[in-house]
């Protein structure tokens, strides 16, 4: 009986450590990568269905223009909701991954280890993304605001709290769930690729490199590169679904993920679903590395291993 109680206590501690470590790791990473996230958001929205003009000629041009006209503060637009989004999503995603993986019986060098990690990553990612989606919606709208400041029908927000308040007033609570399913699908795909690739790559790397920061970085670089290609079409659709609504002159133009992808490809060509790809990679690569490295270190810290 006492053994079972101790096991339950240890499992609860592992979940708590995983959640707290994931949240703190994502906040640290977000502070560094938010400017490139803002650039990615604007690149994905410009030229939308040929209804808006093209402002930026790539990642570097966007970064320079935003810094020149809006300064450092402009590059960190949406940072507060980004913190809440990442802490919620990554805390749940990283905190529950080991729990789900263990429940599925995923163990290195055993049958179906990769597939079980894939399922665990997708499930953990979808749950985390759905929980953090309202914060992501507010973040996207705040990051895009200065692109549409001359649009008389666009409603800007003075703060994250004001954004939530205005969205609820104009669109109802349902407005905060806009794009939630697409966000869950996007992150399920990304998490499945990232976490399963990271785990498998880490096990391979450990055959040649001692367990430590270099092993984490190499594993994270591989996971970050692969996940960008798989996620970008979902990411473009999610950004556009978040931004549409009663707060801009375009109004309701998409019914969901597939409708958004179809209309985007039809009006802008197939390459449009890869808008912001390099910004996405430049953000996701370092963000993946920083998040997973911080995650490993925080887990060791809270477990008393450091």
From Swiss-Prot:
The chain crosses the membrane at residues 16-36, 84-103, 118-138, 175-195, 212-232, 277-295. GO terms for molecular function: transmembrane transporter activity. SUPFAM superfamilies: Mitochondrial carrier (SSF103506). It comes from the Eukaryota. Keywords: Membrane, Mitochondrion, Mitochondrion inner membrane, Repeat, Transmembrane, Transmembrane helix, Transport. This is Mitochondrial substrate carrier family protein ucpA. GO terms for cellular component: mitochondrial inner membrane; mitochondrion. PANTHER family: RE38146P. It is a multi-pass membrane protein. Residues 1-15, 104-117, 196-211, 296-306 are mitochondrial intermembrane. Belongs to the mitochondrial carrier (TC 2.A.29) family. It is found in: Mitochondrion inner membrane. GO terms for biological process: oxaloacetate transport; sulfate transmembrane transport. Solcar repeats lie at residues 13-103, 112-204, 211-301. Mitochondrial solute carriers shuttle metabolites, nucleotides, and cofactors through the mitochondrial inner membrane. Transports oxaloacetate and sulfate. Residues 37-83, 139-174, 233-276 are mitochondrial matrix. It comes from Dictyostelium discoideum (Social amoeba). Its main location: mitochondrion. Gene3D superfamilies: Mitochondrial carrier domain. Present with 5350 molecules/cell in log phase SD medium.
């Amino acid at each position: 009986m006492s053994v079972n109680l101790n096991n339950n206590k240890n499992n609860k501690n592992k979940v708590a450590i995983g959640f707290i470590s994931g949240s703190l790791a994502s906040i640290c990473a977000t502070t560094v990568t938010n400017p490139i996230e803002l650039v990615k958001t604007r690149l994905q929205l410009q030229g939308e269905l040929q209804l808006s003009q093209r402002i930026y000629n790539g990642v570097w041009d966007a970064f320079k223009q935003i810094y020149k006209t809006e300064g450092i503060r402009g590059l960190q637009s949406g940072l507060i909701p980004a913190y809440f989004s990442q802490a919620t999503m990554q805390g749940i995603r990283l905190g529950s991954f080991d729990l789900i993986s263990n429940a599925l019986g995923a163990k290195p060098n055993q049958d179906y280890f990769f597939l079980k990690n894939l399922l665990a990553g997708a499930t953990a990612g979808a749950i985390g993304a759905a929980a953090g989606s309202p914060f992501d919606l507010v973040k996207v709208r705040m990051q895009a605001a200065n692109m549409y400041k001359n649009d008389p029908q666009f409603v800007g927000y003075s703060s994250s709290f004001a954004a939530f308040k205005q969205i609820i007033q104009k669109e109802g609570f349902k407005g905060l769930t806009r794009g939630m399913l697409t966000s869950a699908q996007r992150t399920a795909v990304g998490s499945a690729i990232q976490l399963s690739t990271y785990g498998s790559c880490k096990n391979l790397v450990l055959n040649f490199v001692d367990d430590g920061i270099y092993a984490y970085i190499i594993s994270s670089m591989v996971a970050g590169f692969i996940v960008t290609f798989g996620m970008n079409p979902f990411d473009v659709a999610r950004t556009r679904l978040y931004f549409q609504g009663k707060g801009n002159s375009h109004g309701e133009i998409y019914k969901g993920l597939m409708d958004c992808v179809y209309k985007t490809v039809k009006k802008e060509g197939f390459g449009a679903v890869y808008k912001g790809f390099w910004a996405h990679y430049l953000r996701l690569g370092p963000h993946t590395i920083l998040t997973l490295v911080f995650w490993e270190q925080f887990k060791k810290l809270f477990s008393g291993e450091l």
